[in-house]
Amino acid sequence: MTWVLASSSPRRKELLAQAGFTQAQFQFVQVSPDIDESQLALETPSAYVTRLALEKAQAGLALSRHLPHPKVIGSDTIVVLDGQLLGKPTDPQDAERMLTSLSGRTHTVMTAVAITNGKRALSRLCQTQVSFTSLSQQDIAKYVATGEPMDKAGAYGIQGLGGCFVSEISGSYSSVVGLPLVETRALLAAMMEQDDTL
């Protein structure tokens, strides 16, 4: 059996290592699946992020067929403000627009995690409320100039410099970083338990 993380994210790699520490000799490899992340018509944010996590796990499985009995973990994170998705910014101006919209407001971070072994798939969704302090245009410009926002949903990283903007969080910190630890541990255990009953 081989655990596989369908993500190249160093943040998710670190979090998965934490989530699996209670599993005997927990080790995993990483693959980088490429999927179409377009939102479907009328798809809710929660349905969208859950679908992407499942599709990443399934695409990761396709890249892991050479491994013995792969179990693949996929995850996706989105930021939702006023019902609108804030994905990764397309350019610095887009990052500035997103950060301006988040300034002084509370938004929802949704992270879905999914595990598949090809025969079954399990998933969980975690929602966390994050409040930003009010940001000046200078704050935003300096932050965008660091480059940190460019590969992150909502144009900020709570575990990095962007954490300076967070005034309050209600929910899972690790989920905002990219992989909810409690939910991931539960899925790892559930997948192991199902295998034991076969």
Swiss-Prot record:
Site (Important for substrate specificity): R11, T77, Q159
InterPro entries listed in its UniProt record: ITPase-like_fam (IPR029001), Maf-like (IPR003697)
Catalytic reaction annotation: dTTP + H2O = dTMP + diphosphate + H(+); UTP + H2O = UMP + diphosphate + H(+)
Record-level Gene Ontology MF annotations: dTTP diphosphatase activity; UTP diphosphatase activity
EC number: 3.6.1.9
Disulfide bond residue pairs: none
Any one Gene Ontology cellular component term annotated for this protein: cytoplasm
Uppermost EC category: hydrolase
Cofactor(s) annotated in UniProt: a divalent metal cation
Gene3D superfamilies recorded: 3.90.950.10
Protein location: Cytoplasm
Family of this protein: Belongs to the Maf family. YhdE subfamily.
Task performed by this protein: Nucleoside triphosphate pyrophosphatase that hydrolyzes dTTP and UTP. May have a dual role in cell division arrest and in preventing the incorporation of modified nucleotides into cellular nucleic acids.
Name assigned to this protein: dTTP/UTP pyrophosphatase
Species of the source: Shewanella denitrificans (strain OS217 / ATCC BAA-1090 / DSM 15013)
